[in-house]
From Swiss-Prot:
It comes from the Eukaryota. FG-GAP repeats lie at residues 35-96, 111-174, 182-232, 233-289, 290-349, 351-408, 411-474. Keywords: Calcium, Cell adhesion, Disulfide bond, Glycoprotein, Integrin, Membrane, Metal-binding, Receptor, Repeat, Signal, Transmembrane, Transmembrane helix. Belongs to the integrin alpha chain family. Integrin alpha-9/beta-1 (ITGA9:ITGB1) is a receptor for VCAM1, cytotactin and osteopontin. It recognizes the sequence A-E-I-D-G-I-E-L in cytotactin. ITGA9:ITGB1 may play a crucial role in SVEP1/polydom-mediated myoblast cell adhesion. Integrin ITGA9:ITGB1 represses PRKCA-mediated L-type voltage-gated channel Ca(2+) influx and ROCK-mediated calcium sensitivity in vascular smooth muscle cells via its interaction with SVEP1, thereby inhibiting vasocontraction. This is Integrin alpha-9. The record marks 565-566 as: Cleavage. It comes from Homo sapiens. Residues 1-29 form the signal peptide.
Amino acid sequence: MGGPAAPRGAGRLRALLLALVVAGIPAGAYNLDPQRPVHFQGPADSFFGYAVLEHFHDNTRWVLVGAPKADSKYSPSVKSPGAVFKCRVHTNPDRRCTELDMARGKNRGTSCGKTCREDRDDEWMGVSLARQPKADGRVLACAHRWKNIYYEADHILPHGFCYIIPSNLQAKGRTLIPCYEEYKKKYGEEHGSCQAGIAGFFTEELVVMGAPGSFYWAGTIKVLNLTDNTYLKLNDEVIMNRRYTYLGYAVTAGHFSHPSTIDVVGGAPQDKGIGKVYIFRADRRSGTLIKIFQASGKKMGSYFGSSLCAVDLNGDGLSDLLVGAPMFSEIRDEGQVTVYINRGNGALEEQLALTGDGAYNAHFGESIASLDDLDNDGFPDVAIGAPKEDDFAGAVYIYHGDAGGIVPQYSMKLSGQKINPVLRMFGQSISGGIDMDGNGYPDVTVGAFMSDSVVLLRARPVITVDVSIFLPGSINITAPQCHDGQQPVNCLNVTTCFSFHGKHVPGEIGLNYVLMADVAKKEKGQMPRVYFVLLGETMGQVTEKLQLTYMEETCRHYVAHVKRRVQDVISPIVFEAAYSLSEHVTGEEERELPPLTPVLRWKKGQKIAQKNQTVFERNCRSEDCAADLQLQGKLLLSSMDEKTLYLALGAVKNISLNISISNLGDDAYDANVSFNVSRELFFINMWQKEEMGISCELLESDFLKCSVGFPFMRSKSKYEFSVIFDTSHLSGEEEVLSFIVTAQSGNTERSESLHDNTLVLMVPLMHEVDTSITGIMSPTSFVYGESVDAANFIQLDDLECHFQPINITLQVYNTGPSTLPGSSVSISFPNRLSSGGAEMFHVQEMVVGQEKGNCSFQKNPTPCIIPQEQENIFHTIFAFFTKSGRKVLDCEKPGISCLTAHCNFSALAKEESRTIDIYMLLNTEILKKDSSSVIQFMSRAKVKVDPALRVVEIAHGNPEEVTVVFEALHNLEPRGYVVGWIIAISLLVGILIFLLLAVLLWKMGFFRRRYKEIIEAEKNRKENEDSWDWVQKNQ
């Protein structure tokens, strides 16, 4: 199967054609041609272009230009009265403009009535121009600064002056001084300073002139009925008594009440500072103007009502209204135009506000003009000037009417500096609605008075291309009709047909087009589901160039294949044919106004393209083809007991979600299960027990989508699979790890069956840690006493006490497995020898390692205290001889007064440690007063975790408490004067003991010795012994 192939040109040409087609028609290149402007130049510094008017008489087209500061060759004695110039469009190769002769008075003081003598100096002739809307329509030209000097000794009266010029621009016209009244001479009162003609409008029967200076600048509108040559008067006292509102600053007229009646509109831009606009019914019976509608501006100083345009935007026969507020500001004078749509009987409803590009100081809305039907779409169009945009270069925006009122987006923006860099205040005046070059389309004329220039911009013919894309009604995805190689594939025939028509368009055109498949997917950045096959090549789009004949249809035929394993069989397959004109050759060009190349019709800012779509067939039992998906699931933590109620950060490496999805309804197309997960999880894999056509794709870091079943999930089927996520990067900032699992399909699903389509699985996240603390003391012991050298201790400035430095280092260690988000350590030191004793320790500093924490403690206000006791030599000696062995100071024992410090840590990662260094001084003067020979200090430190931070301490882990011990040893040597006393008392005691013994011995007779008897007895004994010895020898 197949159709004719597209021309196989170079890839470069194809890319160029694609760029042209996709780009569409830029806003600056619709059917007004800025490349070939017709430029008219006026006298220097004359404000040539302040007002412009397109005009025709018979077959001659003219551009009429007001130059309100020009000198007049017909009135050389008048100082800068201003002039109206006529510029012929055809047969005027030099673009010359000539002044209209209005047969005006040439001298100051020319009579103009019983009590009227004119002064034309600086009268600003040409400040406004208007044309009667018919074939031989006359022209209205005004000079609002024209003055009546009849009473110049008392008052000079700026009545204003208008002149009706015949259609042929040659015969003498009619003079209008609408504010002149005989014998009225006071400036300001009534119409004495009315300045009529500052704005003017012409209908078939009415001449409308604004007079903003009447009634002390309350203003009014002067309306002349040409049928009976009478003026319609405004008698509304409420309006007339509102001074300084400037009613009549802008005027227009239209069919507001009924398609057959004319109503008059006047703007009062100073009314209450915000501006107003009024619509008046012209009641010819009473000869008055009766107010039927009013609207107010929205911001102070916006000058709402300073420009007006009545135009039937939606083609319902009733005029709609555009009101300019050129000084409307968000930043500075960007300008705004409010659009009011006529709902009948003069009831207007605000539709929207237009702002152009909202450029700084643009004064968008300074001028508004109806252009008639610029592009032949059946609805009138309008131009809005922004003369100060681009630093006074100026711009004009073109907006199109439609059945709804007005298209909010402008179709083109005409930039003055791009048309001609010399243009200044381009857009101050605009005129349109007349075909100036004879090609059947109305053209637009724009004034740029600060460069004394006028530009005629011609409209190009507009081509309407009719495009049809023919597709099969549906695609049966279960019955392939084509082959791609050896593989059967689904396919469809695609036919595109083109024809064109338009007003005054060429008989033949060249058309570039690009036919794209499945554009809805491409616009979403997704892969298309179909592709074209041309001569064995596959491509996502077809690019061709056609030659079309007027009102004849040309068709092309193609074959598109459906990709295998298409997931989405619910959304339609959209084909789009985007097209653009090829380069058009216009033939021989005329010297003055060469023919313009046509353009394609603008589609209200949309892409110039045509779309059609087809769908996949579906096999459904119910009319609404409703699926009924049911979702079940369970969390499984790896390497964890099922009884564990939380996920320990760092302990669990991955987590699995076991999912079961069932379909109890019709076949579910594009069935999928999506997972909204934490961005800290990483998708590892999807597991299924057997191949069931399930595939998963991570669309975002926190969004996983799994397609279930291909090409659809059958009715009464069930699928089970698991998705596995890596949890090693969880930070723990979230309290709960949640999974939102949703089952959905492209089918509709009844509301009563949606309750089981979503599953929320959650598990708390906890920090599981095993903390421990160790400590060391330096020194572990020291000796104190009176005989200990003072150099072993330190003294603080101006203090007598001797201090022993004590340094303690504590280390907190986190074994893991989780990071410890925060912890604290409490430390206690025995600080007094007794409950009422003085404080012994003075903490100098506590430092947390790496500055990842802070400590707090209570400083000792009086670190140096020397206990003062009443000296008693006998008590001192007694204490020396009765010193006990060891005293233990432990904060856990009752009655012990302790110093407590606290330290808080920041996060402590797994297998990391944190140290606390404590620098203290111990007052040894207090120790000296104690009777113990050894004082043992037991300092304790304990690490604590905060349950509020979701921290769990592992049971039966490392100890969270440590005891650090050091000892103070007394040297047991008494003071010097005590030693003397001990020696003296010892001698005294010895003598007393000796005397006591002597007395005792004396009393016992120790000193009564019988020396004589003893000696004699000893002598006798010796003799006896001697005689015994002799006897024995003789035997």
